[in-house]
Amino acid sequence: MNNYMINPSIVDLLTKVDNRYSLVTVTSRRARQIIDGDEALVNVEDAYKPLTTAIHEVNAGKVSYESLVEGIK
C-alpha cells in the first residue's frame, strides 16, 4: 500500500469551489477539454493524466466556473 498524501488535498481544493459536486464537475470537464486538445494552464512535472493536470489547474485558481442559481423546473 502506498503511504503518501494526495497533493493537492481535497480540503485545499474545496476552498476553490463551492462543494464536492462542483469540484468533480469542474475537474472532469476541464480534463475533457485537455483531452480534446486544449493547452494546459499550469506546468505539472508528473502529470501524465489530464485529470491530474485539471486538478492542479483548479488548485492554482486557473479554472473558473459559474454556478447556476436556477433549479430544475
From Swiss-Prot:
GO biological process: DNA-templated transcription
TM regions (residue ranges): none
GO cellular component: DNA-directed RNA polymerase complex
MF terms in GO: DNA binding; DNA-directed RNA polymerase activity
Catalytic activity: RNA(n) + a ribonucleoside 5'-triphosphate = RNA(n+1) + diphosphate
InterPro entries, sorted: DNA-dir_RNA_pol_omega (IPR003716), Pol_omega/Rpo6/RPB6 (IPR006110), RPB6/omega-like_sf (IPR036161)
UniProt entry tagged with the keyword Transferase: yes
Pfam families per record: RNA_pol_Rpb6
UniProt keyword terms in alphabetical order: DNA-directed RNA polymerase, Nucleotidyltransferase, Transcription, Transferase
Record bears the keyword Transcription: yes
Oligomeric form and interacting partners: The RNAP catalytic core consists of 2 alpha, 1 beta, 1 beta' and 1 omega subunit. When a sigma factor is associated with the core the holoenzyme is formed, which can initiate transcription.
Protein name: DNA-directed RNA polymerase subunit omega
